[in-house]
Amino acid sequence: MLPKLRLIVAVIVLVSACSSGGGGELPAGPDLMKRAAEAMRAVKSATFSIATEGKPQVPLKQADGRLTAAGDADGTITLDVFGILQEVSFAVIGETVHFKGATGGFQKMTRAQLAQFYDPSVILEPTRGIAQLLASATGPEVEGVEGSSYRVATTFPGQVTGQIIPGVNQGVNAKIWLDQATARLAKASLPLPGGTVTVSFSDYDAPVTITPPPAG
């Protein structure tokens, strides 16, 4: 019985070690966040997704699209406008925004006009976007490894978070996932009053060309 007991204990220990994501010493939180901010400032393009769970008190409910560091972007945004969800397709090219709702064709507005509602191109903007959000984090603590990412608990100031998620005006105790190899942001979970906003990124630096939608 004793050899069998030892074998069972050994298996339990091995499984526990694997499931913990352990393996090597975890990096210091502030150092990792500094690397992450620098990595995000160097990003040339990315695919992004913003989703909500529950009923967080923000007008942006969902967004999916592509971004370039130059500020061009395209995709779809779902906004809560006076209690009614409205999905808008968009293409931001230079200072011109092409957009359309559920019906009708594309119309145009300026980037400044779009910014009154939500400008997704700010996400990769170094001084207001994700890079600045990571640089402004306080008390980052690396909790462990999940898949190929470090899971980090940290707090983001509301002023900076609100640039990316309009309607946020208070500090957010967030969980973020940073790629181990590149330190780029893979995902961020932002608990807010009423629910949670999750921001995800993929396809970093893939070739992206944003073109105007067909006329008519």
Task: Tell me the role of every PLM-derived stretch.
Residues 18-216:
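Subset-of-secretome marker
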